[in-house]
């Protein structure tokens, strides 16, 4: 049961349930457009998975461990002596990570206040499509009413049915981000973005990391050229890859380690047993809708539990909208959720709102990084699209040579008839930054010649994007 702490005379125009990247951005944008807005977040800290236990803390650890690895592996070539003597204090590394996270979460709370968004710390559940009960973290219940509600509750890690998370030995991404000591042996089940990034963190600090993957290759949605380059680089940095078709058994031991028996793909599918003291399960994420009361209010979900939405983020129930990881549209990425939050708020304010799902980048923050947008070569072949390929390696790029970050390449795919850019795939130390130029080009329908004839600063790694585009419509100059 719920109780109203005060009479509701003036309902909110918009209540956003969830304060992650999609939710808090939607709330701020709605308020900026003149709508009376509230945001409800049960975590007690804004920013969602991304800021608290995802994108941001993982980047903090990736940065710290890259500096450590770089000191040991590369400093002497720059004439910086003594790098091999650098040590890592994991506790201090974790403290710095938390400092970054706390600063950003408090910053988001300030932004809500600045934009006059009412912030409720608690768990929201639908009583009716226009009434929400908020169970406050202070133990009090409060009913709030809204003309429109945006569901932005995000997602949570998926556990294997026979292997629940204990966050000590069997880890989700949350547990892997919080380790206080380096595992001697880590097995990562799932060779996607999360598994590869967090495997890299602990491999750089000396853990023996093995990534096992059900698909024929790690990061199976990437262009195959990109995957091959990435896997090769990770192996050189201490991560092994084992393809498998199944898991036959998992056995615990009394010394805090486990034995994992895998059915390995090659050599006739024989069983192989891997021992580890940390098992990271990164087999995907599932939408988080527990306690929302969607079923009793007849909000439609698909067979996997995602909220079904239409072209304007509307559910089948009037006044109820949904964005981000919880919906059945687009990749489960923070920046996708942010764009949906802006577009949904604009629509609720009576303005046009749109997300171009064909131009949403994906980045893996390993070293080298991988960034992709648009179609892969495999997708174009499958669709029967006539296309051209332009590639340029970073070992022919002046800036990359000067700073000894020569791994990788840029690959551009264009329509053979029109020269319009259909996909861009980058492997290099700064791929996540370089992809921005490709996004802008694709968003505005640019051709490879448009980019190839645009003057790029020298020496920069962005020149590799220009040269790859030149390879599509003419020839490269520097390779």
Swiss-Prot record:
Key words of the record: Disulfide bond, FAD, Flavoprotein, NAD, Oxidoreductase, Redox-active center
Cofactor: FAD
SS bond partners: 50-55
Keyword DNA damage found: no
Origin superkingdom: Eukaryota
Reactions it catalyzes: N(6)-[(R)-dihydrolipoyl]-L-lysyl-[protein] + NAD(+) = N(6)-[(R)-lipoyl]-L-lysyl-[protein] + NADH + H(+)
GO BP annotations, alphabetical order: 2-oxoglutarate metabolic process
GO cellular component entries: cytoplasm; mitochondrion; oxoglutarate dehydrogenase complex
Record-listed NAD(+) binding positions: 190-197, 213, 247, 284
EC number: 1.8.1.4
Active-site residues, as the UniProt record annotates them: 458
UniProt xrefs under NCBIfam families: lipoamide_DH
Note: The active site is a redox-active disulfide bond.
Subunit structure: Homodimer.
Family per similarity comment: Belongs to the class-I pyridine nucleotide-disulfide oxidoreductase family.
Protein name, as recorded: Dihydrolipoyl dehydrogenase
Species of origin: Trypanosoma brucei brucei
């Amino acid at each position: 049961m719920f109780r109203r702490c005060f009479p509701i005379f003036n309902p909110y125009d918009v209540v956003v349930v969830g304060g992650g990247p999609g939710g808090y951005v939607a709330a701020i944008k709605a308020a900026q457009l003149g709508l009376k807005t509230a945001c409800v977040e049960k975590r007690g800290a804004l920013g969602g998975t991304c800021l608290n236990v995802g994108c941001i803390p993982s980047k903090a650890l990736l940065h710290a461990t890259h500096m450590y690895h770089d000191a040991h592996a590369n400093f002497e070539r720059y004439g910086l002596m003594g790098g091999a003597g650098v040590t890592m204090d994991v506790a201090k590394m974790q403290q710095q990570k938390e400092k970054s996270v706390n600063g950003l979460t408090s910053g988001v709370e300030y932004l809500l206040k600045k934009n006059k968004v009412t912030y409720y710390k608690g768990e929201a559940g639908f009583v009716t499509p226009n009434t929400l009960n908020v169970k406050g973290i202070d133990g009090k219940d409060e009913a709030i009413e809204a003309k429109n509600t945006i569901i932005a509750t995000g997602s949570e890690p998926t556990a294997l049915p026979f292997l629940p998370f204990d966050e000590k030995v069997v880890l989700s991404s949350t547990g892997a981000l919080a380790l206080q000591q380096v595992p001697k042996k880590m097995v990562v089940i799932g060779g996607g973005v999360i598994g590869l990034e967090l495997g890299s963190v602990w491999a750089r600090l000396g853990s023996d990391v093995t990534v096992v993957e059900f698909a024929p290759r790690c990061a199976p949605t990437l262009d195959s050229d990109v995957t091959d380059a990435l896997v090769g680089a990770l192996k050189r940095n201490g991560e092994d890859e084992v393809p498998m078709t199944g898991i036959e058994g998992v056995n615990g031991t009394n010394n805090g380690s486990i034995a994992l028996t895998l059915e390995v793909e090659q050599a006739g599918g024989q069983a192989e047993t891997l021992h580890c003291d940390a098992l990271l399960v990164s087999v995907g994420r599932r939408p988080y809708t527990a306690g929302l009361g969607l079923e009793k209010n007849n909000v439609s979900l698909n067979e996997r539990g995602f909220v079904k939405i239409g072209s304007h983020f509307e559910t089948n129930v009037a006044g109820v909208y949904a964005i981000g990881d919880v919906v059945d549209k687009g990749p489960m990425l923070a920046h996708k959720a942010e764009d949906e939050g802006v577009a949904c708020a604009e629509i609720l304010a009576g303005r046009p709102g749109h997300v171009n799902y064909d131009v949403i980048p994906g980045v893996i923050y390993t070293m080298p990084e991988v960034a992709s947008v648009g179609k892969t070569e495999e997708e174009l072949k499958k669709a029967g699209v006539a296309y051209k390929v332009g590639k340029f390696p970073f070992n022919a790029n002046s800036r990359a040579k000067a700073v000894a970050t020569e791994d990788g390449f840029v690959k551009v795919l264009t329509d053979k008839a029109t020269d319009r850019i259909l996909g861009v795939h980058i492997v290099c130390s700064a791929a996540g930054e370089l992809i921005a130029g490709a996004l802008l080009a694709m968003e505005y329908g640019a051709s490879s010649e448009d980019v190839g004839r645009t003057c790029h600063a020298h020496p920069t790694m962005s020149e590799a994007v220009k040269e790859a585009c030149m390879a599509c419509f003419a020839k490269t100059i520097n390779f």
